[in-house]
């Protein structure tokens, strides 16, 4: 009888910087989610955290195609009766530009404990400056 061989965890994670300036939201989100899951590595395992850390800068300058700036809606609910809040892409981009990329990437990650763990490896900043210089991140060209 053969035993199931599980791959050894490669704990050396890399840090990548992605510039979101003038990038399309969906296309950059797929690159980010693939890096977070580790699909760009030969040691990818669907049920293990083999991904890397991702720093996204200039999230305030991400774009969407077509007329989605006015038509794409983001909904949230306070939990109270009548507490549904709806805002467009343009309104959310002026109020919280990081939230747009976070919501897009979170929808592409697996649901459950692994997805929540992978989501903590995503760092999004609206400007060109980030505080993760000590990790020596590599620039990732999209």
UniProtKB/Swiss-Prot annotation:
Keyword annotations from UniProtKB, A to Z: Chloroplast, Plastid, Ribonucleoprotein, Ribosomal protein
Principal subcellular localisation of the protein: plastid
Gene3D superfamilies in alphabetical order: Ribosomal protein L13
GO molecular function, one term: mRNA binding
Coiled coil: none
Family annotation (Pfam families): Ribosomal_L13 (PF00572)
One GO term of the biological process aspect: translation
SUPFAM superfamilies in alphabetical order: Ribosomal protein L13 (SSF52161)
Subcellular compartments: Plastid, Chloroplast
GO cellular component: chloroplast; cytosolic large ribosomal subunit
Family classification: Belongs to the universal ribosomal protein uL13 family.
Assembly and interaction partners: Part of the 50S ribosomal subunit.
Protein name: Large ribosomal subunit protein uL13c
Organism: Pyropia yezoensis (Susabi-nori)
Gene name of the encoded protein: rpl13
